[in-house]
Amino acid sequence: MCDRSLYRSGYVGSLLNLQSPDSFYFPNLRANGSQLAALPTISYPRSSIPWTCPSPCAAQPQGHAFGGAAQPYLPGSVPISISSNSNKECLEENSKYYAHDASSKQEERCRQRQSFANDPTITHAANLKPAKYDHSSLPRSLHGSAALFEVNSCTSSLKEDIKNSVNLNLTVQPAAVQSCLRPSVQDGLPWCPTQGRSRKKRKPYTKQQIAELENEFLLNEFINRQKRKELSNRLNLSDQQVKIWFQNRRMKKKRVVMREQALSMY
């Protein structure tokens, strides 16, 4: 039987030129975190590191896992160390650092706003007032009768201006409307003939007139011009009114006949 010691990883690795598992990690570290004395330590120059943590985190003792070497900064990550106490201190310092930075930025913004508000050269919209009512520059002794007199005079002048404008609107507006409604005689033709010509009001027929027209319609549906003139003179109607009444009466009779025919079919 063959010896099983020949199949060990150290012997097979030496034949196949394979490195030991410790070589895949940091060459100066072991699994238990101790440092090899024979191998040289890895050291990075401090200028090559883009970011270093604050003073308690940067000044770590040499007895830790990484020794004097510092870990490069990766964006979105937190510096990692084996000791839990130093990691907690680092996180606390980072939070303090960023909180202090944010508070300092807010203080700067508040100072800028205060300086902007206190700047006398800049006038705000809320502080804009008419010059007549601004008495802040006057001494207190002049805020008595002179200021009241000026305010009263301003209010009275404003009231007079409002009254005059209202009176002008009331007097000018109807005149303008009447001038638009009246026909323009100078031009020869009315500006709007429909407005210039007044429409006659409809006069309803009296019962006596309707009775006379109905009797004449029963005798003859179509009347001549002579008969129409006689009816108009007798009933005190115009020739056009008599003509229109007979036309409407014939249409009414036609509708009645068509309705009776439709009902008889059903």
From Swiss-Prot:
Keywords, comma-separated and alphabetical: Developmental protein, DNA-binding, Homeobox, Nucleus, Transcription, Transcription regulation
Pfam families referenced in this protein's UniProt entry, alphabetically: Homeodomain (PF00046)
Subcellular location per the Swiss-Prot or TrEMBL entry: Nucleus
Entry comment describing in which tissues the protein is expressed: Expressed primarily in limb buds.
An example Gene Ontology CC term for this record: transcription regulator complex
Family to which the UniProt record says this protein belongs: Belongs to the Abd-B homeobox family.
PANTHER family in the record: HOMEOBOX PROTEIN HOX-D12, HOMEOBOX PROTEIN HOX-D12-RELATED
UniProt subunit comment: Interacts with MAF and MAFB.
Biological role: Sequence-specific transcription factor which is part of a developmental regulatory system that provides cells with specific positional identities on the anterior-posterior axis.
Protein name: Homeobox protein Hox-D12
Organism: Gallus gallus (Chicken)
Organism taxonomic ancestry: Eukaryota, Metazoa, Chordata, Craniata, Vertebrata
